Amino acid sequence: MKIASNLKLFLGLASLSIGTTSPALAIPVGDSTSYEMLSEPANESEVAETSKNFLGTVALSNCSGALVQFGKAEPTSPALVLTNGHCVERKLPQPGEVLVNLPSRRTFNLLDRSASNVLGTVNAKAMLYATMTDTDVALYLLDQTYEEIKEQYGIDPLTVTDQKPAAGTPINIVSGYWRRTYTCSIDGFVPELREDGWIFRDAIRYSENGCAVIGGTSGAPIIAGSDRTIIGINNTINEDGARCTRNNPCEVDRTGKIVVRKGIGYGEQVFWFHSCLATSGVEVDLQKPGCLLPKPH
């Protein structure tokens, strides 16, 4: 998991259930919930200059993310931002925990096309959903509509796919935090990706060259080629070749065989959201029949 911090920290989240609200508690740098993270900038050889387009991406204080829209949302709907569950401003979600409908004051910087400038800052009013179970996602509701953001900053949201991506798909991982783009392809899918106590299912494995993601790239959108569709969300990489430990995820196949791939990065699925969206397209309905997202116990 790729949070940026000069002290290599990992933030945490408190356990909450549907409908529960609680004041936001940011964990400061150096807190006892520290989690080792890389923070060095990427090697320029890993960045495809020709594929850089940062419109729709956002920079968080510790991670990357994107301004997103699902198919049903209207221009007058409140806008959404998508990032990793381990990037939220609260305590780290433990295995099995799901957080929903929490107040939030998180801020996100919108970047211009080349990431040379910050066009402005948008603000969350709620964290609609966050988890590190089966996937690693957090979805924020903003206090502005898509239409208002377009009028003020000229930014359109990125569309989130409703289909599972295919192996071999060329991808760009666009990090708003580092203002860098990584280019590779989807090598395949992992039935079970283990990292310490967390388990991610149907994880996206990156090809060997081009996507050696680092701290701060967590939550960056995985964009399919040049069509600007988000087909996944960047998450983690095996840094040291260790087996199933923090910052060293391992693959578990359907027979239970464990495989370690040092230097290989992974993302998580996002199409699951479509199975859980309310008719508004900006609310998560975990009781909807067929909803694939994990639910609070």
Predicted regions and their residues:
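Bacterial N-terminal signal peptides
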Residues: 10-20
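Active-site region of chymotrypsin-like
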Residues: 52-63, 145-155, 180-273
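Bacterial N-terminal signal peptides that target proteins for export
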Residues: 2-11
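PDZ/PDZ-like groove recognition
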Residues: 138, 255-297
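Active-site substrate-binding loop(s) of clan PA
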Residues: 66-72, 125-131, 141-181
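A conserved glycine-rich beta-strand in the N-terminal activation segment of trypsin-fold
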Residues: 53-84, 219
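Boundary at the C-terminal end of the N-terminal hydrophobic targeting segment
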Residues: 24-26
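Conserved catalytic-core segment of clan PA serine endopeptidases
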Residues: 29, 34-54, 69-71, 89, ...
